[in-house]
Amino acid sequence: MLRPWRSLLLFFGYGVGVGVMVVLLSIGEALLSQARDERLVGGGSVTVLPQGLDVEVMKTGGVGGLYFSIDHGRFIYDQLLASPRLAKVISAAAPQIDGRLTYLRTAGGAEYAVRASGGIPSTARNVGVPLELAAGVWQDDDGDRKWISPTARELRHEIDRFHLPPANTANRDSWAEWHYFNVLSPDNKSWAFISFIVAGDVTSEKWGGSVTITLREQDGRSRKFVSYIPRERVRFSTTDANLSLGGSTVTVRPDGDYAVSAEAREEGGRDVVRVNLVVTPSPRAYFPGASLGSGDFVSGYAVPALRASASGRICVNGECENYMGAQSYHDHNWGVWRGVTWDWGASRAGSYTILYGRVLGPDRYGRETPLFVYLVDSLGFRAVMRPRRIEYTDGRTIVVDGKRIPVPSRAVFADVRGADTLRVELTIEDAIGTDTRKQAEGQSPFANQTRSADAERGRSEERGDPLRAADAERPYFIQMKGAARISGRIGGGVIDGTGTGFFETYR
């Protein structure tokens, strides 16, 4: 049931992902009295800049020359500047590149250094700064349309596509990438974890796929089902989210929903599980993803469906559980890792949905590492907070391989950022554990990926290669289900909500 790599979200020491994006806005500092200065890039009432950029740099044309930019600009545009939440205060917004140093080569081979500017025609006109045309026409093309207003299907493919290991990546044989889904029963008493995994160095011949499905009953038993797929029967793409692992598939439908179909056999038994679900992401409830690292530490994480509903059925030997609009979630993970642990969670909380986490690499043990907390509501992105710590109360006990392990019964974290406050309280209702040391002694879950699918049935895990995940001091990987309650004030308004979610830590 291991599910390692949501941790990618969690390189919070670097202010990963949306944490970085939102900080980059530096909106408070961007309310510049010089905003209409003719020497400034732009020309609107507000110019959004990378954090720390000196306004004088803009006046001298340094923005283009130094290649300043705002990471994940499309997300900033969609979730903040052009969002329904700010529609009453922002009438128009436009991305702009100004004075970028570019080299132009003529048909005759002559090369010239030029300054180039660019933007999206319709948005530039809306803010009153269209580029001057010497000749021709300047109008939106399909790429501009996708940037401004992608369809749900286009958005899924953009943030949920697959990747290749960077050329300088060490330990390429431990590369793994996967789609993960979960679905919760209407009574909140049972749930399923479903993973579609591609593992190994996909640029070589030593890689393959697997499907792992775990069915869990609260305070009851877990059943794990696994299918191995040789690379010849695996299809993935670096331009779209669709994945085929033999007969098991993840397909983005024209309406942007996910069609999820999977089949696997129970470990140590003959029972077969078949999954047929349609997962519908809630509008605007997504985390666009981030990819960081170099050498032996490369990873990425995206959440295309932070809040979603699932309809369909999960059947074991023809005995089916039906779902209609059930609570669901989907994320996408990729990378390589060694010697890390993490805290992670995703939960509904009334009309809100919360995502939190942090990763602790070998160099972070014993050091305080803040959490990253990402909050959305029906209008999309609401806030990013950075609690300094998460406080666990180990009031429960579980048995792992005959040993009693204390695990959390409660967890609390909170943060204050200016006038904004957030407090999150987790009440744990179910927990299971895995001794990663024992897993390391057994068959690697992906060691057989270069062999035929039925050559052997080694140990398999939920979320990729866990063998190097835990440190010796905290070898037990703990997966929890429970209730989350949030409270506080964001943007001058009270927030409050309670809901169900899944959480992870180590002991």
Can you annotate each of these PLM segments?
Residues 133-450, 454, 459-507:
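Structured soluble/peripheral alpha/beta segments that form catalytic or ligand/cofactor-binding pockets
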Residues 19, 25-115:
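Hydrophobic, regular-secondary-structure patches
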Residues 1-21:
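N-terminal Sec/SRP start-transfer signal
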Residues 110-135:
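Short beta-strand boundary microenvironments
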Residues 58-61, 105-106, 127-129, 193-196, ...:
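Short, glycine/acidic-enriched capping/hinge loops at junctions between secondary-structure elements
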Residues 57, 101-104, 123-127, 284-288:
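Short, well-ordered, mixed-charge alpha-helical segments that flank or form enzyme active sites
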Residues 12-14, 49-51, 96-98, 119, ...:
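Acidic/polar N-terminal loop/beta-strand segments that form early-domain functional surfaces
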Residues 14, 36-39, 84, 105-108, ...:
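Short secondary-structure boundary/capping segments within folded domains
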